[in-house]
Amino acid sequence: MPDNKRSQHITQGVARSPNRSMYYALGYKKEDFSNPMIGVANGHSTITPCNSGLQKLADAAVAAVKASNANPQIFGTPTISDGMSMGTEGMKYSLISREVIADCIETCAQGQWMDGVVVIGGCDKNMPGGMIALARTNVPGIYVYGGTIKPGNWKGKDLTIVSSFEAVGEFTAGRMSEEDFEGVERNACPTSGSCGGMYTANTMSSSFEALGMSLLYSSTMANPDQEKVDSAAESARVLVEAVRRDLKPRDIITRKSIENAVAVIMATGGSTNAVLHYLAIAHAAGVEWTIDDFERVRQRVPVICNLKPSGQYVATDLHKAGGIPQVMKILLNAGLLHGDCVTITGKTLAEELANVPDQPRADQDVILPIERALYQQGHLAILKGNLAEEGAVAKITGLKNPVISGPARVFDDEQSAMTAILADQIKAGDVLVLRYLGPKGGPGMPEMLAPTSAIIGKGLGESVGFVTDGRFSGGTWGMVVGHVAPEAFVGGTIALVQEGDSITIDAHQRLLQLNVPEDELARRRAAWKQPAPRYTRGVLAKFAQLTSTASKGAVTD
């Protein structure tokens, strides 16, 4: 089988002479047409520090492809900064960017008959967008994560971007001085790289090591460090070899490898967004995987990493402690990973982990042995009940008791809720309900980091519940339940909640319940009318029309 089995459709034969003319304009030589064409999907952007350090990785990948006797074809992919758009209408474009990125990569890879694709990304939706594209096209591919940011520091305290969000609540509550507020603001993000805790970007990139689609150790490297550049080059070399072996994404992305990825997400205390994204990745790969599978894995896998947002450390600390391979070796030895899954190197996961120590080093407390796990079960619980018949996702780490029953405080938009929080109108025992923010209703299922961080900054993180059909940032912790499905816009029960209704969140019982009699709910349902769509033109309108429910990944195909 030729190495250029796809690109030969666009480069070989008399009829393709005009095509070759255009390649000659790019500097190609005649002998290049028998070599594979390797796309380099470059997410470099100066929109956000998450992506501002990607060009050097793309340059390294291009050089490595050339050195491997293949032809690099670099093209761009867009990004949205979740952190910068948070709390604004711009946040509605975040999840949509996942689909746009996937479509961009699919369009270039398929339209140009690429033989393989190196995907390079940084901010949150870059990772699932790229992986969806690779799974959907089944073109040989590898994911190169841009790397994490280094922690900031103010007065001896390590900072992340979440420090800035929480400072808003602390400052408005009078619990932080103006000097400290500005000091945190100026110092939270000192370098290029993605947000530093086990937030969404680091969650997804870490899980890609376990999935088998990224090189070991690559997900916890810091973007400014030379090893990140070296890893990008090595990733490109590995991808060219995968093309020559005809090793495709769907050979790697299987039900068992997704289970491995989810196990690592649970063990590291990762983001709720991973639930949505792995439902979408599985859909793209044609793998049967449901929201209930996350709960099945959660009940088996303990949390063994002490990482922000609910823990103490950041990704650079995890890297120094042994990285994701150390986490995986512990899980593998405990029978919690499938070691026979093939990886992008062609080796099995067990073979890749053969030289990793069986136990974490004793001189660190970032990665813990299973017998000293922070939590005996995973932290992303799937709740169901009359308020979420299809399911909802709760993040239950960092809480003394993940149970609350209290009066509903109902808001149909994020800004109204934020105003109420900052004005001290939300009290201990309340359950905030933010609705009409789901995939169709938002549209785009915006994240709620600003209000949840404000609640924590006000000192209410343990005592106020938060329920939404939108999403939460990977930086969120507290009594939070998101991804409520069915969403309000399609008439889900969350649309029927009224101010003062009693709501129960019980992570132990995996219950999300509106404590209102059935006959009253039936009366409200009969009176409910679907609101007009917020957008009727453009990408938001298209997404709202096409998207599935959150319980199926909010996919558009």
UniProtKB/Swiss-Prot annotation:
As cofactor, the record names: [2Fe-2S] cluster; Mg(2+)
An example of a Gene Ontology BP annotation on this entry?
isoleucine biosynthetic process
Catalysed reaction equations from the record = (2R)-2,3-dihydroxy-3-methylbutanoate = 3-methyl-2-oxobutanoate + H2O; (2R,3R)-2,3-dihydroxy-3-methylpentanoate = (S)-3-methyl-2-oxopentanoate + H2O
Q: Does the keyword S-adenosyl-L-methionine apply?
A: no
Q: Which GO terms describe its molecular function?
A: 2 iron, 2 sulfur cluster binding; dihydroxy-acid dehydratase activity; magnesium ion binding
- In this chain, Mg(2+) is annotated as bound at D82, D124, K125, E447
Q: Does the keyword Iron-sulfur apply?
A: yes
What's its EC?
4.2.1.9
Residues bound to [2Fe-2S] cluster: C50, C123, C195
The annotated active site, in chain numbering, is S473 (proton acceptor)
Q: Which family does it belong to?
A: Belongs to the IlvD/Edd family.
Give the record's subunit note: Homodimer.
> What HAMAP family does the database record attribute to this sequence?
IlvD (MF_00012)
What name appears for this protein in its UniProt entry?
Dihydroxy-acid dehydratase
Which classification does the entry list for the species?
A: Bacteria, Pseudomonadati, Pseudomonadota, Betaproteobacteria, Burkholderiales
